[in-house]
């Protein structure tokens, strides 16, 4: 273990919901009291005072977003000239690839914003200490689309662990454990008012997932995973 590893939060899988609750308790406690679409962009820009900008980050959307922890140069991709170049960024700048929304969906963009906001909330100290130890600026932490396999955790770096944390906490921020149950019950009740569901022409679970995703403004895949991990769907 290197000296920096002591600054990586040690979070068990069973503590991920508590992490999301801690984040929301600090920045937007109403979201754990009342079922709502968590206003993650407002949280990031107006409450955390992060600067959110859009730039392409890769040719193939392999990087969805990146968080800038110190002033310095950040690499972006210029699709017009098909080249990578650097731009100056200030600490607290969140860069989102516009294709996160254009080629995916709004839920993906919101999840990326929650992901990067969590990095700032929980991992900023690590990156600031790393900058001091290296005696250089470390402005950017780039977040890959495809996470590292959990089957090789023994080989993970500090960055891999922090990425795992952000990957798992972000959807929990957008769908807090404190409100998902109430939303599920509401959607389950309303589903029987849908003619196709009532007549057995459409699976009730499919309708519930779709409506829950719309309520929280997340992807249907994210909503289904969340409802299953909390035991509301089998």
Residue ranges and their predicted role:
Residues 1-234:
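Active-site hotspot residues in diverse enzymes, especially metal/ion-binding acidic/histidine motifs
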